[in-house]
Amino acid sequence: MDDSSSLASPVQSILAAARRRDPPTRRCTVSARSLPAALHSAAADGRTPIIAEVKPTSPTTDTEHSGDPAELAREMVAGGAAAVSVLTEPHHFDGSTDALRAIRDAVDVPVLRKDFLLTEPQLDAVAADAVLLIARFLGDDLGDMLAAARDRGFQALVEVHSPRELARAVDADADIIGVNNRDLTALTVDLDTFGAVAPEAPADVTLVAESGIATPTDARTMRAAGADGLLVGSAIMDGPVRDTTRRLVTA
């Protein structure tokens, strides 16, 4: 299924924990708010289309963030975020499905569930407007997972890091693709990754730049390289949430 042999140790630990999670017993169905439409609307209004992420902590940082998740999300939207991403991975990111439920009730923008989903039943843990599917982890199962997500009403943001993974995502009929600037082998970030991968995507695919976007200059660089949306977590969580979101939105 997944290609994990060369992944960084923290990533291997995340995947091992994901495999051990008990699957939900009830199927989830969703009437989703459109993520591509929200990104397009933000751009049409002259805003940089930001997907702001509620991320309590991460294996790549020593920082921990407290605070009510729903209030954080409201602050992000007040700062102009087009959508909100929510970590639901409990063991390494301190995320929860309860936080996502509260956030989706609190805001009227699309909410992305960011987690490490390896099997179809894991899709059923919580209703969200979109789910993250990581091409490298799913391997040959990507197409089946994408179809299963859509069958439940989810949109899927398919994450890639290389032209090869992009080709697999396109072959699986992904229509929202995120290019992760973070190399999951070394956990290093290179903002040039997006510019190297994105030009190979079909014109009708919604492209999202992920990881390492910290400043208005970074945001402008990603937009100039073709990003339809920018997923930003740590840079927003590490500062005054509303003000930091607004600085990126107005880049």
Curated annotation (Swiss-Prot):
It catalyses: 1-(2-carboxyphenylamino)-1-deoxy-D-ribulose 5-phosphate + H(+) = (1S,2R)-1-C-(indol-3-yl)glycerol 3-phosphate + CO2 + H2O. Keywords: Amino-acid biosynthesis, Aromatic amino acid biosynthesis, Decarboxylase, Lyase, Tryptophan biosynthesis. The keyword Transferase does not apply. Its EC number is 4.1.1.48. InterPro entries: Aldolase_TIM, Indglycph_syn_Halo_TrpC, Indole-3-glycerol_P_synth, Indole-3-glycerol_P_synth_dom, Indole-3-GlycerolPSynthase_CS, RibuloseP-bd_barrel. It is an enzyme of class 4 (lyase). One of its GO terms (biological process) is L-tryptophan biosynthetic process. Residues 1-12 have a biased composition (Polar residues). Pathway: Amino-acid biosynthesis; L-tryptophan biosynthesis; L-tryptophan from chorismate: step 4/5. It comes from the Archaea. Residues 1-27 are annotated as: Disordered. Disulfide bonds: none annotated. One of its GO terms (molecular function) is indole-3-glycerol-phosphate synthase activity. Belongs to the TrpC family. HAMAP family: IGPS_A (MF_00134_A). This is Indole-3-glycerol phosphate synthase.
